[in-house]
A protein has these predicted regions:
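Terminal, regulation- and interaction-focused segments at domain boundaries
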Residues: 1-15
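Hydrophobic transmembrane signal anchors and adjacent membrane-proximal interface regions, especially
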Residues: 7-8, 34, 41-43, 56, ...
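Short, intrinsically disordered low-complexity segments
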Residues: 13-83
């Protein structure tokens, strides 16, 4: 599949703000475009066989260690690897470090 991560946010009210910050902070790289959705965003690439590069959305936990069932968290699925994905992941780490809300990055 790809790299899968979650972001647990201490206060559910902070999820939307954090999602917006993540979307705004990602470096713009030629060949990709962002599509905003109600529950997150997707970075699409110019590849008809595999258009999704990165998906970030709000999901509800089910049988996940460290989260209660139905607890919302931010789901991050990197459909691709390589240099571009590493740049996005590092940028997302920095956003979490800079944000005032309590958020924890974890690997799925």
């Amino acid at each position: 599949m790809g790299w899968e991560y979650g972001i647990k946010v201490a206060d559910v009210k902070d999820i939307k703000v954090l999602m917006d910050r993540l979307a705004e902070a990602l470096p713009r790289i030629d060949g990709y475009r962002m599509q905003r959705k109600k529950d997150g965003f997707i970075l699409l690439q110019n590849n008809p066989d595999w258009p999704e590069a990165l998906q970030v959305s709000v999901e509800e936990a089910r049988n996940m260690e460290g989260l209660k069932d139905d607890e919302p968290y931010i789901y991050c699925l990197f459909h691709i690897g390589g240099e571009d994905a590493v740049k996005w992941r590092e940028c997302m780490y920095r956003v979490l470090e800079e944000e005032e809300c309590a958020a924890e990055w974890f690997e799925l």
